[in-house]
Regions:
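Charged (often Lys/Glu-rich) extended helix/loop segments that serve as interaction or gating elements
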Residues: 1-139
């Protein structure tokens, strides 16, 4: 499961008269390149709270933080209409290749890998920091 924090929301009119909510998140093609490379299809759901059923659902597309038109993590998904900046989206079944295919594209840091068992949790690999990236720079 990959967890993303919602960083922005924008409703866009479509040619068919409908609309789609674009949901930008704090990750993208640098931590999950599979949708861009292989057209891998995922879904997403709100993980940090129970959405209000009265709010209904809305057609959405989850996009990453990179300046690339192909940075689409979830192409089409119904998400709660009361989705807000700061909400956490869970993208299940991203597979084991997320970390090994991850990159520092655009100088973004790679996410950590966590373990959870019996109510306990910890890092298998901690998230990278900007200091980690800068430590690799030459003189």
């Amino acid at each position: 499961v990959m967890l993303y924090t919602v960083t922005g929301l924008k409703r866009v009119a479509l040619d068919d008269g409908a609309s789609r909510l674009y949901v930008s998140v704090d990750g993208g093609m640098s931590d999950n390149i599979r949708p861009a490379l292989y057209k891998a299809a995922y879904t997403a759901l709100v993980a940090n709270r129970r959405p209000d059923p009265a709010a209904g659902m809305t057609r959405a597309r989850v996009v990453g933080k990179h300046c690339e038109s192909g940075d689409i993590l979830v192409r089409d998904v119904d998400l709660p209409a009361d989705l807000a900046v700061g909400d956490v989206l869970a993208v299940p079944a991203v597979g084991a290749y997320g970390r090994c295919l991850a990159s520092n594209y655009n100088m973004f840091t790679r996410p950590g890998v966590a373990w959870v068992r019996d109510g306990r949790q910890g890092w298998v690999l901690r998230p990278e920091t900007l200091e980690d990236l800068l430590a690799l720079e030459g003189e």
